[in-house]
Amino acid sequence: MNIHEYQAKALLKGYGAPVAEGVAILKAEEAEAAAKSLPGPLYVVKSQIHAGGRGKGKFKELSPEAKGGVRLAKSVEDVVANVKEMLGNTLVTAQTGEAGKQVNRLYIEDGADIERELYCSLLVDRSVGKVAFVVSTEGGMDIEAVAHDTPEKIQTIAIDPETGVTAADVAKISSALKLDGAAGEDAKSLFPLLYKAFNEKDMSLLEINPLIVMKNGHLRVLDAKMSFDGNALFRHDDVRALRDETEEDAKEIEASKWDLAYVALDGNIGCMVNGAGLAMATMDIIKLYGKEPANFCDVGGGAGKEKVAAAFKIITADPKVEGILVNIFGGIMKCDVIAEGVIAAVKEVGLKVPLVVRLEGTNVELGKKILNESGLAITAADDLDDAAKKIVAAING
């Protein structure tokens, strides 16, 4: 689960991180009062969407010369003018795709005198089984580009979970970021509290880009991105309350209600599979034969008829889907249950695109019998390769 920048900053502020004062607004009429409540005279108006690259983004409704989704304002009047241009419009960034995202809220923040921009993130480094700091002196830009072009400028410092962030760890991180003086002193408290927040809130990612050194020498969190482990949300009511469903795909929201692992993708072949590994293999073979998957959908090992039907309905609700491939290996999941779920869903929503089903495992013959006797236009496949060829051929006509 992701949250907005202003929510992430509020959470970090609660741990003692240095963040600027700011106010989130939903209506243009709130802009003037919000700006006047801040010290000024420099302000920043930030689009709040769940996507990066906002500053370089462009609004669909505005001219190509118009400013992006993060703007400096030098007066209250300037803030108000920018808010009126930005709020309610569609921001297109490198991460949103061509459709973009509607800006339903803005964050008006007090400006900062920036001396240097740095990059700092925390994530789970699975190669060593520890939470690690990933840092770079090249902040304020696309870290993927830095990793590709100048990987030597990125350093990773793994933290021992038994000790937490030690003075030696702080020294390593500070050295990597070339922090000294007031910034070096700030680092002694900042990095341990970031680690504490990451662990206590079960985050999967905490990214600060940029972390700045101000002209007065002190550190400040200028931007913050947080992602949380969805499997741990049951113990974080405060985090769940921050969820903004308007930023999420409606199909993914519906899938979460059924405890389905569903991720919307950009292709045209819908996939329903049991098991993450089999789902990845299914998507790979679809790409091998020249098409793209429309989703990742893992119904899990113990899904019942209703859950299978729900998954099928979610997949067919995607207008991009031109064909559906069901690929099930029945272990705990029984093939007859899958067959019954698919048939129930097809009868409810109708079948307007080709459907190929490959079943193998527990009760496979019964599952095939149920499908064959359904009277529906369902194409059976003998194995995964056969299934992929058949669904691609059906779409190609």
UniProtKB/Swiss-Prot annotation:
Function, as annotated: Succinyl-CoA synthetase functions in the citric acid cycle (TCA), coupling the hydrolysis of succinyl-CoA to the synthesis of either ATP or GTP and thus represents the only step of substrate-level phosphorylation in the TCA. The beta subunit provides nucleotide specificity of the enzyme and binds the substrate succinate, while the binding sites for coenzyme A and phosphate are found in the alpha subunit.
First-tier enzyme category under EC: ligase
Record note on cofactor: Binds 1 Mg(2+) ion per subunit.
Family the UniProt entry places it in: Belongs to the succinate/malate CoA ligase beta subunit family.
Domain (ATP-grasp): residue spans on this chain: 9-254
Example GO molecular function: magnesium ion binding
Cofactor(s) required for function per UniProt: Mg(2+)
Name listed for the protein in its UniProt record: Succinate--CoA ligase [ADP-forming] subunit beta
Positions bound to substrate: N274, G331, I332, M333
Entry keyword annotation includes Transmembrane helix: no
Residues involved in ATP binding: K46, G53, R54, G55, E109, A112, E117
GO cellular component, one term: succinate-CoA ligase complex
Sorted UniProt keywords: ATP-binding, Ligase, Magnesium, Metal-binding, Nucleotide-binding, Tricarboxylic acid cycle
Keyword Translocase: no
GN (gene name): sucC
One GO biological process term: tricarboxylic acid cycle
Biological pathway: Carbohydrate metabolism; tricarboxylic acid cycle; succinate from succinyl-CoA (ligase route): step 1/1
Matches recorded under InterPro entries: ATP-grasp, ATP-grasp_succ-CoA_synth-type, ATP_grasp_subdomain_1, Succ-CoA_synthase_bsu_CS, SUCC_ACL_C, Succ_CoA_ligase-like_bsu, Succinyl-CoA_synth-like
Coiled coil start-end: none
Catalytic activity: succinate + ATP + CoA = succinyl-CoA + ADP + phosphate; GTP + succinate + CoA = succinyl-CoA + GDP + phosphate
Chain residues that bind Mg(2+): N209, D223
Listed EC numbers: 6.2.1.5
Oligomer status and interactors: Heterotetramer of two alpha and two beta subunits.
Species whose genome carries this gene: Rhizobium etli (strain CIAT 652)
